[in-house]
């Protein structure tokens, strides 16, 4: 038997919490890591966990929020570009493309926070953290 910290909810050996303060994906992931050892944006590995997380969000979210970050990120492994042009000038616009690519995962309100959707990582959204009990 294990216990989560006050304010956190337990499901299947993990602790979960919804945070309403909007952050971009990277900041949300960093925030989760600071909450506890092995803390991350939530991973959803079973249908039961998906139902639990959807319920938790529905009970804790501010109603006008449409998306909630989860720990899903599209990694571009095959695009290993060098970071400067052959004339030595630095690559600046490549970062802009990355910022606006829809690479980060969220749950959407219209599906009752069950359907995954890809959003631009710089969007500010509430998020769910998950960690194994300490």
From Swiss-Prot:
Provide an example Pfam family for this protein. Answer: Lectin_C
Functional note:
Potent platelet activator that aggregates platelets via both GPIbalpha (GP1BA) and GPVI (GP6). Induces a tyrosine phosphorylation profile in platelets that resembles this produced by collagen, involving the time dependent tyrosine phosphorylation of Fc receptor gamma chain (FCGR1A), phospholipase Cgamma2 (PLCG2), and LAT.
Question: What is the organism of origin for this protein?
Answer: Trimeresurus albolabris (White-lipped pit viper)
Q: Specify the protein name.
A: Snaclec alboaggregin-A subunit alpha'
Example of a GO cellular component annotation carried by this entry: extracellular region
In terms of domain of life, where is this protein from? Eukaryota
Q: Where is the C-type lectin domain?
A: 1-134
Q: Which UniProt keywords apply?
A: Disulfide bond, Hemostasis impairing toxin, Platelet aggregation activating toxin, Secreted, Toxin
Presence of the UniProt keyword Amino-acid biosynthesis in the record: no
Q: How does it assemble?
A: Heterotetramer of the subunits alpha, alpha', beta and beta'; disulfide-linked.
Q: What protein family does this chain belong to?
A: Belongs to the snaclec family.
The disulfide bridges present are 4-15, 32-129, 104-121
For the keyword Secreted, the answer is yes
